[in-house]
Amino acid sequence: MQNKDREIMPLVEEAPKPGTWTSLPAGGIIFVKHPSDAEMADLYALTQVEISPSVAPMEVVLAVYKHNPDSFLGIYTADDESRKNAKFVGYYSFLHLNKEGFDLLEKGSLDVRHPDTKYIVPAGERPAAIYVWAIVARKVNRFVMPLIAKALGAQNYGGVPLYATAGTMGGMGAMKGVGFEGANEKDAGLGQLFRLDSPPPSAIRAA
């Protein structure tokens, strides 16, 4: 959770635009989209390598994704706009929490390793808060953040507060550097909850 999450919501557009892309300096393109069912296995394997072997069980990951596909946006590279021979290189994942889930998160009672979908809004519904569940975007994050923003759109996500937990000192420093603050206490540390407020949809439209 140590990436520059602050830049996600301020950049979101009014309507979601799945599959947006941009050119890479070294050639080719990078794009984001909802992973296919088959690609979820690759996503899970990458998570175990890049984050931890003891992440949420695969059945939990699939249940969250089925409940709200916006929980996962895959990152892909390809030679050109045809997207032939596209390669999966990473992803962003979120828990789009309803009011009950948000309340549990603030109290420190939400099990984010085994989240129950009853605390997550279904697809198309505006969440009360967004918890950054995981990010794997090695060497491509600066290209991907605007694409994630466009894919989500401001209608459901603009103005929704972002939450994340710092797992490393480097991650905590990066989070503080982009504006995250302790959600429950000013001097929050490792393993504690951080919050970042994003502008409402009206402010995004006016920008």
Label every PLM stretch briefly.
Residues 75, 92-94, 137:
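GNAT/GCN5-related N-acetyltransferase fold signature
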Residues 105-179:
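Acyl-donor binding region in acyl/amide transferases
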